[in-house]
């Protein structure tokens, strides 16, 4: 989920996730096949021994015959995804992300005994992140296979969100359930010049078109450990250079990120990578520009936008990344001006952490605040989520919470009309010994 640079806000590896599942399935199949071969071999050996042994051989044959094990089929994900990942990993040991060793002056961390000890102490914390990451991988890979032009954005968004809730095992319909697991924030489906924070509200009839460039940005969480990852879908290869530029820029940011690294250095590296690309559209060459007022960000428990920003252009921010922090490294490229403004109807909202206590005169605002606190806490939500909980005629109260400084609204962020924007994003953990790209998968 994008972090925007505004004065208002300033004030306030695995390629093995599916690979592991496939490997496990393959291993089960191979084991069962091996058992069948062993049984067959035993029977052949017994048959050869029978003429020599007679009745005694029959007894020996019975003794030598191996006992067949019960063959339990490997658990696999359904289509659409509905099997909780906890059922696929019953020992609660989830695949780790891509492991990247620290470089330069931080290379000692990989072998330092004290750092290794600290890393082992964080196992529960890591398993929650890895479980959420596995949910994200399985859901997004299904989405990539099935999303097609002609679908409504509502159908796409709800399909992704329903899958995340099913795989985390938290439907979010009971008070407090969504705080335990489920959607980390609403599924963003931002089209073409719209770069971020667009999800359909009730009644939206927008349909995905063949020539669209759609950013798919959603989060999954377990116990508030939010995995924030995004990708861009197109159905025309003419946009491939744009996607390649943004993917390269994001991977550059991931490579440069690390403990004690300055934000300005990361931004400079990202910009250099991104702006080395250009894309030809309708016979005109367009340089790919970084969207300079969109950033990556750190992630705190139950809070998608922490207090630090990761720029995607060169700047003077001397803030450093620190050990134990979690960051969403996301980059946005555009064929337009490389600058976004708020536009279109707002759908995303979030309770402001440590918001001041303000007397509310509207009873609808008071009631809605109670619903938000009990169901979302500081996790972002959208209007469809309130509809899903059975809330009605809440818009006046919601706007009152926004104007009172209790809830933050996140309007869609758009470049100039006619331009195209793309996004790729991963969540990384700055562990004491290594950097873990927790959301990495076979797809990106």
From Swiss-Prot:
Substrate binds at residues 197, 305. Residues 34-45 have a biased composition (Acidic residues). It is found in: Cytoplasm. Its main location: cytoplasm. The keyword Glycosyltransferase does not apply. Residues 1-92 are annotated as: Disordered. The keyword Cytoplasm applies. Pfam families: Peptidase_M24 (PF00557). Keywords: Aminopeptidase, Cytoplasm, Hydrolase, Metal-binding, Protease. Binds 2 divalent metal cations per subunit. Has a high-affinity and a low affinity metal-binding site. The true nature of the physiological cofactor is under debate. The enzyme is active with cobalt, zinc, manganese or divalent iron ions. Most likely, methionine aminopeptidases function as mononuclear Fe(2+)-metalloproteases under physiological conditions, and the catalytically relevant metal-binding site has been assigned to the histidine-containing high-affinity site. One of its GO terms (cellular component) is cytoplasm. PANTHER family: METHIONINE AMINOPEPTIDASE 2. This is Methionine aminopeptidase 2-1.
């Amino acid at each position: 989920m994008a972090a925007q640079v505004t004065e208002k806000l300033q004030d306030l590896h695995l390629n093995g996730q599916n690979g592991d599942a496939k490997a496990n399935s393959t291993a089960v199949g191979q084991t069962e096949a091996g058992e069948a071969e062993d049984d067959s071999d035993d029977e052949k050996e017994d048959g050869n021994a029978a003429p020599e042994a007679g009745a005694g051989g029959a007894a020996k044959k019975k003794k030598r015959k191996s006992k067949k094990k019960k063959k339990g089929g490997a658990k696999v994900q359904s289509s659409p995804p509905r099997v909780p990942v906890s059922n696929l990993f019953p020992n609660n040991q989830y695949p780790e992300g891509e492991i990247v060793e620290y470089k330069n002056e931080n290379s000692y961390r990989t072998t330092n005994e004290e750092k290794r000890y600290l890393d082992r102490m964080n196992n529960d914390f890591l398993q929650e992140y890895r479980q959420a990451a596995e949910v994200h991988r399985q859901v997004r890979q299904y989405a990539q296979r099935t999303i097609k032009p002609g679908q409504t954005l509502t159908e796409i968004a709800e399909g992704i969100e329903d899958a995340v809730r099913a795989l985390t095992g938290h439907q979010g319909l009971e008070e407090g359930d969504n705080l335990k697991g489920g959607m980390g924030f609403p599924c963003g489906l931002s089209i073409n010049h719209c770069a971020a924070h667009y999800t359909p509200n009730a009644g939206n009839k927008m349909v995905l078109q063949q020539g669209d460039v759609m950013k798919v940005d959603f989060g999954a969480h377990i116990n508030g450990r939010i995995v924030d990852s995004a990708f861009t879908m197109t159905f025309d290869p003419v946009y491939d250079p744009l996607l390649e530029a943004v993917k390269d820029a994001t991977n550059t940011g991931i490579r440069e990120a690390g403990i004690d690294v300055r934000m300005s250095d990361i931004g400079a590296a990202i910009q250099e990578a991104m702006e080395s690309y250009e894309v030809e559209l309708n016979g005109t060459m367009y340089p790919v520009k970084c969207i300079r007022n969109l950033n990556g960000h750190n992630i705190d428990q139950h809070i998608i936008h922490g207090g630090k920003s990761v720029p995607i252009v060169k700047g003077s921010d001397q803030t450093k990344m620190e050990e134990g922090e979690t960051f969403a490294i996301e980059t946005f490229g555009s064929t337009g001006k490389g600058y976004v403004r708020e536009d279109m109807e707002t759908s995303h909202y979030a309770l402001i952490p440590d918001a001041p206590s303000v007397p509310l005169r509207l009873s609808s605002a008071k009631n809605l605040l109670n619903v938000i606190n009990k169901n979302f806490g500081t996790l972002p939500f959208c209007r469809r989520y309130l509809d899903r909980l059975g809330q009605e005629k809440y818009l006046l109260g919601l706007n009152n919470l926004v104007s009172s400084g209790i809830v933050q609204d996140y309007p869609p962020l758009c470049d100039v009309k006619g331009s195209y924007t793309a996004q790729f994003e991963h969540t990384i953990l700055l562990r004491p010994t290594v950097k873990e790209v927790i959301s990495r998968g076979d797809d990106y």
